[in-house]
Structures are given as structure tokens and as C-alpha cells.
UniProtKB/Swiss-Prot annotation:
The keyword Lipid metabolism does not apply. Induction: Expressed in the late phase of the viral replicative cycle. This is Polyprotein pp62. Keywords: Disulfide bond, Host cytoplasm, Late protein, Ubl conjugation, Virion. One of its GO terms (cellular component) is host cell perinuclear region of cytoplasm. It comes from the Viruses.
Length: 530
């Protein structure tokens, strides 16, 4: 029988010796990576619950229909810091949940917390390899806090809040908001994968709330375009890197100035409020805002019957992919024809009006096709980011770089890199992505819910949509953390994310990554690291 280890390269090895059942639960919840020092810049500390009651509760919830409580409890036991002794239990520290730990008392070999009243002692038999920033503590009594004020990670060489870099040109109010959100997202991803607060979610909800309260006609214009991924919604609504033209989806006068939004946070429960916006995609919402008392108004079908819009889009999809000539010439032209019909006549297969007049007017001149290709690319890159075992700023920088330099929205038709027929002509040569790979992405785009996209109320998502199949294995546990650990609030977002992602194979995602890496510039990585 093998002897027990005396030094440890991993916390999981120590757990295997002391509590293999708990280790199995952590593994089954796809959380082993959370115990790896490589994931965190400042090492990692695990709080082992000595109390059988806590471990039994974790087990009960882990193997229930809703494991979110087990995940949250386990995350409260993981600190993204290397804390080997009570002397290091100081300053701004917290658990993987993002909750700040308030220390009541430290002794030579003991720490007592205020919130949760946990009594912690270092594990006497845990000695990490010299090059591993790992620590294990034993929780003798009490519990780790699941709720409370967040902690702020201190930056090396400066204060808690790094200044927003000013060296970007042009530096517009839209750009300023985007940079602040990107830096906040990068910070919280490095802390806890944004499990406590998602900056993209917060800003998207705030902007939509502002429009709903102060500019209802703008609100009904943009509502059919919002996406279940807050990151996608944020960039499509704000268009922060557009530097040419004045055809913004939301005018400058609405967003900025004495009575403008100006990036103000306007939310109480971002997740619940974000979900509510999708439930407002109804006939009644449109009629309440449109001046139906003084003029006759056709209710757009995206409001009156959004499920049928998706059905007609699916007919177009089927026609394109079952055409007797699916190739690099015919297929992209059929895609363009479908979007041209929508942009010019506000119909899909002569069925319409699909969007409010204000919406379709804002989407002409290839903007609708540009938007939907943008959705597709960001969804793919975002999934790749969230599926990584460890977070790297460089991976997120690829997304930002693509948005800033390859798809800013300055020339919609020239920025089409997957759907444009020009990309498949004999005379077109490009070093960024092979033609066959590009065509594979085009087919994947047609198969996705990003094709001829319209937002759909939450009760319709994943219902009768023919694209939706067995999807539960496609949503990683970390995505739950990224959005929120309240599973009941997440149901709508999870279902929508699954629908979007079903068609994105790993090969397609790798092609997207390759494409982005070879287009754009390196300034974004430098920007995020400043």
C-alpha cells in the first residue's frame, strides 16, 4: 500500500489523502482547476471544513437537481491568495465568491473571522513544494461567509483603482466607458471569474434601464436587438470603437450631455433586470410606447410574434443549406440576398414588418448583417475564453482587439469577413484565414441563431426552436460563475447561451481564434496591462 505524501504539488493530492469523497465532488463539479495555483496570480488557499455537517450539505446539494449551492459553498472555501500563516491574513482578502473576509482576531496559530465566525488553523500536515504558492487551513468551527461586501484587490505599484489610459486616439465618451468596463472585467476575471459582478451585465442593464425610463422610443428600437450574452449586448448598443459616420444605433445626444446616460449605473439586481427586458418583447410593450392613440401603427412581428420570425428565419436557413449548390460562390450570395430583403423591405420571405420602422432604418446599408456576424464572432471567442482552465488577459485582449481594429463599425460591408461574397472570389487572397476554414465558419453562422437574429422572450427560448437539441453538456460550470451563482436567475441566460452555442464546434472556435490572432494589433493587450 503506498505511503502518504509528506510534501504536496497540488491541494488535490492532499485532499485525496484526507477526504477523497470531497475531492470527488469537487471534480464532478468541474472545480478542480479552482484549486490550482496556476489559475491565480497570487497563489491559492483552501479552507477545509472539519465539520461533517458542512461536508454533508455540500454533498447533498452537489448531487441534487440544483448544484449551485454546493458550488457557492465550495467557492467560499477557496481564497485566490497564498496565505500560509495568520500574519498574512490581513488587508483586502476574500474568497472566490468575491466576498470580503473580515478578520476579528489573529493568534500565533489561529484566525477568527467576524463574518461567519469561522475559526481557522493552518493544516499542520500540509507542506507544499517550495515553488508552489499553496496553503491549506482547517475550519474548526463556524462557516465561511456566502454574502457580504466585496473585496478589492490591490494593484502592485499603485492604488486600488488604476487610471483609465488616455493614450488611445480618438478618445470618445463611448470609448471611455468601454475601456473602463474592459479593465473592470479583466480585473474581476483574474479575481474570481466575475462570479460576483459582471461589468458587462451591469452596464448593459443600466443603459437599457435609462432608455426605458427616459427615451422609450429608443428603447423599443433597440430591444429586439439585445443579446442574452451581456458582452454582445454592450458592444452592439454602445458601438464604442466607431470613429467614422454618425449612424450610431443610439444617438450621441441620448447617451451623453446634461440629460444623458453618461455611463451611470442604474440597477438593483442586474441579473433579474436583464431577464426582465426579454420578457418585455411583447405586443403590449410596443403599443404602450408607440403613440397608438393618435395614429394607426402596425405592430412589428418581432414584438407581436417573435417565435414566428424565428420560424421564417429557419425556413431561409434550410433553403440556403439544402440548395443544390452549397459552395463558396452561391452560399454567401444567398446569405446576402436574405439580409438584403430584410434591410430593404423589413421582411423575411415576404413576411413582415419584422422590426419597428426606427429599428430597420438604423440597420440598413449592411449594418444588420454586420451586427449578426459580430454576434457570431463574439459568441465564439467568448466561449473560448470561458472554457479555458485558467484566465489569461491575452485571451480577452483578442476579443477587444477584434472589436477595436477589425470590426469597429466604420465600414460595414468592408468589415464583413465571413459572410461577404467578396471573401470567396478567385482574386481574393488573405493571410488571416484559409478559404475552406472561412467557409466552414459561414456554414456555422447560417446554422446559428445569430443568423437573421431577433431577440425572443425567455419563455420561447429553447422551446420549439429546431436548432436546439441536447445542450446541457455545452454550458461549463465556470459560465455559471461568470453570470451568477443564483441558478434560478440564470435559467433564462443558460438556455439562451446554449441555443447560440449549439452549432459552434471546437474546430470552428479554433478557426475564430486563429482569425482574430492574425487580424488586428497588439495595442489592446498593452492597454489592459497598463
Amino acid at each position: 500500500m503506498p505511503s502518504n505524501m509528506k510534501q504536496f504539488c497540488k491541494i488535490s493530492v492532499w485532499l485525496q489523502q484526507h477526504d477523497p469523497d470531497l475531492l470527488e465532488i469537487i471534480n464532478n463539479l468541474c472545480m478542480l482547476g479552482n484549486l490550482s495555483a496556476a489559475k491565480y496570480k497570487h497563489g491559492v488557499t483552501f479552507i477545509y471544513p472539519k465539520q461533517a455537517k458542512i461536508r454533508d450539505e455540500i454533498k447533498k446539494h452537489a448531487y441534487s437537481n440544483d448544484p449551485s449551492q454546493a458550488i457557492k459553498t465550495l467557492e467560499s472555501l477557496i481564497l485566490p491568495f497564498y496565505i500560509p500563516t495568520p500574519a498574512e491574513f490581513t488587508g483586502e482578502i476574500g474568497s472566490y465568491t468575491g466576498v470580503k473576509l473580515e478578520v476579528e482576531k489573529t493568534e500565533a496559530n489561529k484566525v477568527i473571522l467576524k463574518n461567519g465566525e469561522a475559526v481557522l488553523i493552518p493544516a499542520a500536515d500540509f507542506k507544499p513544494f517550495p515553488d508552489r504558492r499553496l496553503a491549506v487551513w482547517i475550519m474548526e468551527s463556524g462557516s465561511m461567509p456566502l454574502e457580504g461586501p466585496p473585496y478589492k484587490r490591490k494593484k502592485e505599484g499603485g492604488g486600488n483603482d488604476p487610471p483609465v489610459p488616455k493614450h488611445i486616439s480618438p478618445y470618445t465618451p463611448r470609448t471611455r466607458i468601454a475601456i473602463e468596463v474592459e479593465k473592470a472585467f479583466d480585473d474581476c476575471m483574474r479575481q474570481n471569474w466575475c462570479s460576483v459582478n459582471n461589468p458587462y451585465l451591469a452596464k448593459s442593464v443600466s443603459l437599457l434601464s435609462f432608455l426605458s425610463l427616459n427615451h422609450p422610443t429608443e428603447f423599443i428600437k433597440v430591444l429586439p436587438l439585445i443579446d442574452f450574452d451581456p458582452l454582445v449586448t454592450f458592444y452592439l448598443l454602445l458601438e464604442p470603437y466607431k470613429t467614422h459616420g454618425d449612424d450610431f444605433l443610439i444617438p450621441e445626444t441620448v447617451l451623453f450631455g446634461p440629460t444623458g446616460w453618461n455611463g451611470t449605473d442604474l440597477y438593483q439586481s442586474a441579473m433579474l433586470e436583464f431577464k426582465k427586458f426579454f420578457t418585455q418583447i411583447t405586443r403590449q410593450t410596443f403599443m404602450d410606447i408607440a403613440d397608438t392613440a393618435t395614429k394607426e401603427v402596425d405592430v412589428p412581428i418581432c414584438y407581436s410574434d417573435p417565435e414566428t420570425v424565428h420560424s421564417y428565419a429557419n425556413h431561409v436557413r434550410t433553403e440556403i443549406l439544402h440548395h443544390n449548390m452549397v459552395n463558396k460562390v452561391t452560399t454567401p450570395n444567398l446569405v446576402v440576398q436574405a439580409y438584403n430583403e430584410l434591410e430593404q423591405t423589413n421582411t423575411i420571405r415576404h413576411y413582415g414588418p419584422i422590426f419597428p420602422e426606427s429599428t430597420i432604418n438604423a440597420l440598413r446599408f449592411w449594418k444588420k448583417l454586420w451586427q449578426d456576424e459580430q454576434r457570431f464572432v463574439i459568441h465564439g471567442l467568448h466561449r473560448t475564453l470561458m472554457d479555458q482552465p485558467t484566465y489569461e488577459t491575452s485571451e480577452f485582449a483578442e476579443i477587444v482587439r477584434n472589436l477595436r481594429f477589425s470590426r469597429p463599425g466604420n465600414n460595414y460591408i468592408n468589415e464583413l469577413n465571413i459572410t461577404s461574397p467578396a471573401m470567396y472570389g478567385d482574386k481574393h487572397t488573405t493571410g488571416d484565414i484559409a478559404p475552406n476554414d472561412r467557409f466552414a465558419m459561414l456554414v456555422a453562422f447560417i446554422n446559428s441563431t445569430d443568423f437573421l437574429y431577433t431577440a425572443i422572450p425567455e419563455e420561447k427560448v429553447g422551446g420549439n426552436d429546431t436548432q436546439t437539441s441536447s445542450l446541457t453538456d455545452l454550458v461549463p460550470t465556470r459560465l455559471h460563475s461568470f453570470l451568477n451563482h443564483n441558478l434560478s436567475k440564470l435559467k433564462i441566460l443558460n438556455r439562451a447561451q446554449q441555443t447560440v452555442r449549439n452549432i459552434l464546434s471546437n474546430d470552428c472556435l479554433n478557426q475564430l481564434k486563429h482569425y482574430v490572432k492574425h487580424t488586428g494589433k497588439n495595442e489592446i493587450l498593452k492597454l489592459l496591462q497598463d
